[in-house]
């Protein structure tokens, strides 16, 4: 019989993560690499674990992730969002715990665009009085 899999798509900044949860012993694999090799910062690894900790399912599921776009922070946020959405498919009763922790909300903050006449989004060229 085919193994049960739960899917979730997460987004953050310009990153998109496709997450699969498979019943297992808690392994996390990101882009076919161990997550500790892929994400070198412990703080971002904690971010990824948040949905599993909030629902007390840490160690019950293997997390298999394909993620592209953005940097470490964006990708970690996208994975967190995807894991939270996949956990909803596992059991809808996780919704209150995930919702109260703010893990189901897509973080809509994006990089502000550069404006003409300015050096960046808001940075103006140096002003000289004389």
Curated annotation (Swiss-Prot):
Gene3D superfamilies named in the record: 3.30.230.10
A GO molecular-function descriptor: structural constituent of ribosome
UniProtKB keywords: Ribonucleoprotein, Ribosomal protein
PROSITE patterns in the cross-refs: RIBOSOMAL_S9
Protein's UniProt keywords contain GTP-binding: no
Region (Disordered): 102-130
GO CC aspect terms: cytosolic small ribosomal subunit
Biased composition annotated in UniProt, kind: Basic residues: 111-130
Protein family according to the UniProt entry: Belongs to the universal ribosomal protein uS9 family.
Protein name per its UniProtKB record: Small ribosomal subunit protein uS9
Gene transcribed to yield this protein: rpsI
